Amino acid sequence: VINFRTAGEEGANIQASRMAATQVGLKYIHIPFGAPNAEVTEEFLAAIADTTNQPVYIHCASANRVGAMWFIKRVKQDGWDTDRAMAEAETIGLRSERLKEFARGYVETP
């Protein structure tokens, strides 16, 4: 489980989420962020690339952050073109123009 929610978000109970995941034998990785940055993105990419963390369930409050990070993963790690990756990210729930801009900018950076 990769959780992008911050402790201060309405309805977020990080400790309960961690306990629920570990009780059923799942790894729990908390990568909290409101506004994305390169550090958070690199942490996510490392976590998702680690095969010991798979299968993986990724969540946030609305799927916007998940969609943005998934877009980046698809382009950077899976070699997808940006149009295909964005279509999938939008299907997942990416609607925020700010997050789309960040994700597009990130994948264009060498």
Q: Which stretches of residues belong to each language-model region?
A:
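Short, surface-exposed acidic-centric catalytic microdomains
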Residues: 1-27
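Sec/Tat-exported extracytoplasmic proteins
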Residues: 2-5, 48, 52, 73, ...
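Short histidine/acidic/glycine/proline-rich micro-motifs that form metal-
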Residues: 5-10, 32-36, 74-76
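Stable alpha-helical elements in mature extracytoplasmic
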Residues: 13, 17, 40, 44, ...
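Helix-loop module immediately N-terminal to the HCX5R catalytic loop
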Residues: 24-56
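A phosphate-binding catalytic loop at a beta-strand-loop-alpha-helix junction
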Residues: 56-67
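Active-site-adjacent alpha-helix immediately C-terminal to a catalytic or transition-state-stabilizing loop
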Residues: 67-82
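Cysteine-dependent PTP/DSP-like catalytic domain, specifically the C-terminal lobe
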Residues: 79-110
